Amino acid sequence: MRPSRRAPDELRPVSLERGVVKYAEGSCLVKFGDTHVLVTATLEDRLPPWLKGQGRGWITAEYGMLPRATLERTRREASAGKQTGRTVEIQRLIGRSLRTAIDLEALGERQITVDCDVLQADGGTRTASITGAWVALADCIKWMKTRNMLKTEVLRANVAAISCGIYNGTPVLDLDYAEDSEAETDANFVMTGDGRIIEVQGTAEKTPFTEAEFLALMALARKGVARLVDLQKMAVA
């Protein structure tokens, strides 16, 4: 039995609320159970120096946690003077994932910066961030369309992410913190709406896992991502 009493293939309650920040071109408040992330997408008329003059745009991401997003206060990284390796890894993952969803040439020489701020953490902050970031990005692109800033379609695919793991010998979907901290194996899957794989991160915490177990986790992830994509489509409709 899972601590949350969910079925092995059951997501936590998920909500995706678009347009929650009035100043941002795109925004989304995403909730995976008790994990809550505020995502904004900002359109900027600038590019990394190495991209200038190439006729295409860029998507980049930043990620951070509020000090009391966790049980005990975590010092702000700004006050520490540097980002942790975990933060850098996650924001690069978010940026990579979103770039697969976009026709960068159709975007033109512009940059969209996606900021993911974790308000409350209960496992799966990176997967919630990616899923909500796609909604914020779509919201930003819709904003651009209403101002005739785009000549062709920019969004190529939905992108969502979910965690899976082996908990008490059973493959389960969408781990919360209680499960993640005790799981024998945990993995994060980033996929497109049609089931193509963007990135997989998997680690055996206690016991190595078999190919069959990995395939079971991937099957759960496909099911979870399909449901998340349905919710994304409803959020941006």
Swiss-Prot record:
Q: How does it assemble?
A: Homohexameric ring arranged as a trimer of dimers.
**InterPro entries per UniProt:** ExoRNase_PH_dom1, ExoRNase_PH_dom2, ExoRNase_PH_dom2_sf, PNPase/RNase_PH_dom_sf, Ribosomal_Su5_D2-typ_SF, RNase_PH, RNase_PH_bac-type, RNase_PH_CS
Enzyme Commission designation: 2.7.7.56
Q: PANTHER family in the record, alphabetically?
A: EXOSOME COMPLEX COMPONENT (PTHR11953), EXOSOME COMPLEX COMPONENT RRP41 (PTHR11953:SF0)
Question: To which protein family does this belong?
Answer: Belongs to the RNase PH family.
Q: Which annotated residues bind phosphate?
A: R86, G124, T125, R126
Please give one Gene Ontology molecular function term for this protein. tRNA nucleotidyltransferase activity
Q: What name does UniProt use for this protein?
A: Ribonuclease PH
Main enzyme class: transferase
Q: Which UniProt keywords apply?
A: Nucleotidyltransferase, RNA-binding, rRNA processing, Transferase, tRNA processing, tRNA-binding
Task: Supply one GO BP term.
Answer: rRNA processing
Catalytic reaction equation(s): tRNA(n+1) + phosphate = tRNA(n) + a ribonucleoside 5'-diphosphate
Summarize the protein's role: Phosphorolytic 3'-5' exoribonuclease that plays an important role in tRNA 3'-end maturation. Removes nucleotide residues following the 3'-CCA terminus of tRNAs; can also add nucleotides to the ends of RNA molecules by using nucleoside diphosphates as substrates, but this may not be physiologically important. Probably plays a role in initiation of 16S rRNA degradation (leading to ribosome degradation) during starvation.
Q: Which SUPFAM superfamilies match?
A: Ribonuclease PH domain 2-like, Ribosomal protein S5 domain 2-like
